[in-house]
UniProtKB/Swiss-Prot annotation:
Parts forming coiled coils: none
Disulfide cross-links: none
Recorded family membership: Belongs to the NADP-dependent oxidoreductase L4BD family.
Known EC number: 1.-.-.-
Protein name in the entry: Putative NADP-dependent oxidoreductase YfmJ
Keywords carried by this UniProt record: Aromatic hydrocarbons catabolism, Detoxification, NADP, Oxidoreductase
Enzyme class: oxidoreductase
Annotated GO MF terms: oxidoreductase activity, acting on the CH-CH group of donors, NAD or NADP as acceptor
Keyword Cell cycle among UniProt keywords: no
Induction: induced by stress due to exposure to 2-methylhydroquinone (2-MHQ).
SMART domains: PKS_ER
InterPro entries: ADH-like_C, ADH_N_2, GroES-like_sf, MDR_fam, NAD(P)-bd_dom_sf, PKS_ER
Function description: Putative quinone oxidoreductase that may contribute to the degradation of aromatic compounds.
Length: 339
């Protein structure tokens, strides 16, 4: 094993859309595991839109990344040194630094079963991504058979799972995405009833009206911004709006840039519920969600797409691509193969 490795640090806080200069590659020693720790080798790294918020030094639901320190997130890794409970060769998942090797407490890692699904799936549909879709839609959205569910960011990892769960529940599903390829994916592969390319639609409001002639009962909001403003005009009485993300405004340079139409009057008139949520709120029910997702996956009711970028050095590029809509499904970076 080499004595040194690469680590990716936050070099500066982004102004608007992140750029390569916001990241720094550092050569650091491979750590020696202490008592209760194991050494793990990074196999896959997950990059997610929420990480953009952590790059700012502002109060949020999770601590910001520190300047000149490693960024971190969901990682699939291989144990390369025996511990008390984990053994060399075990494949594990954890929230780890963006580096090639890490010394980690065994309690911070969870062994995964790669006989049920490929390791990468545990960062996507069987991980936080799938659980976000599951709890956000079913606990807040509560779709009923025959209702119309609209999903923005529908070809992304969360959105595509939301739409499929809504179909399982008997809803009519309309997805919003940003390319013809993604529209075909939603309609042909995932069986969405309608899909709208917001980048080519002449009038997003009219396109939504045509796709939702009976109005909108559930809107799973992944993007915020003008797309969400248009959906709000079509809410039915007692509509439910789980607010999962606001990727359209993550790169706003000030709060003023994030200002849009006021929705209070629409919520009052339709007696609708709009609720933000964080998947960690449901941590005591993760086993419930994971079990159901695995059953649906095994039964062929859920399908998932991954965009896998090769190479540790390409982690920043993969992250930046999230904000350009370059990924279809879950964006991952493959760093290495198991031994």
């Amino acid at each position: 094993m080499t004595a040194s490795q690469q680590q990716i640090q936050l070099a500066r806080r982004p102004q608007g859309i992140p750029v390569h200069e916001d990241f720094r590659f550092e050569t650091i020693p491979v750590p020696e595991p202490k008592q209760g720790e194991v050494l793990v080798k990074t196999l896959y790294v997950s990059v997610d839109p929420y990480m953009r918020g952590r790059m700012q030094d502002t109060k949020s639901y999770v601590e910001p990344f520190a300047l000149d320190k490693a960024l971190s997130g969901g990682v699939i890794a291989e144990v390369v040194s025996d511990g008390n409970h984990l053994k060399k060769g075990d494949i594990v998942i954890g929230n780890l630094s963006w580096q090639e090797f890490s010394a980690v407490s065994e309690s911070a890692l969870r062994k995964i079963d790669t006989s049920l699904a490929p390791a990468s799936a545990y960062l996507g549909i069987l991980g936080m991504t799938g659980l976000t879709a599951y709890f956000g839609l079913l606990d807040i959205g509560r779709p009923k058979e025959g209702e119309t569910v609209v999903v923005s960011g529908a070809a992304g990892a969360v959105g595509s799972t939301v739409g499929q769960i809504a179909k399982i529940k008997g809803a009519r599903v309309v997805g919003i995405a940003g390319s013809d390829e993604k529209i075909d994916y939603l309609k042909q592969e995932l069986q969405f009833d309608e899909a709208i390319n917001y980048k080519t639609a002449d009038d997003i409001q009219k396109a939504l009206q045509n796709a939702c002639p009976d109005g909108v009962d559930v809107y799973f909001d992944n993007v915020g911004g003008p797309i969400s403003d248009a959906v709000m005009n079509l809410l039915n009485e007692f509509a439910r709006i789980p607010v999962c993300g606001a990727i359209s405004s993550y790169n706003a340079e000030s709060e003023a840039d994030d200002m849009g139409p006021r929705v209070q009057s629409k919520l009052i008139k339709t007696k609708s519920l709009m609720q933000g949520f964080i998947v960690s709120d449901y941590s005591d029910r993760f086993s419930e969600g994971a079990k159901q997702l695995a059953e649906w996956l095994k039964a062929g009711k859920l399908h998932y797409e991954e965009t896998i970028t090769e190479g540790f050095e390409n982690i920043p590029d993969a992250f930046l691509g999230l904000f350009k809509g370059e990924n279809k499904g879950k964006q991952l970076i493959k760093v290495s193969d198991p031994s």
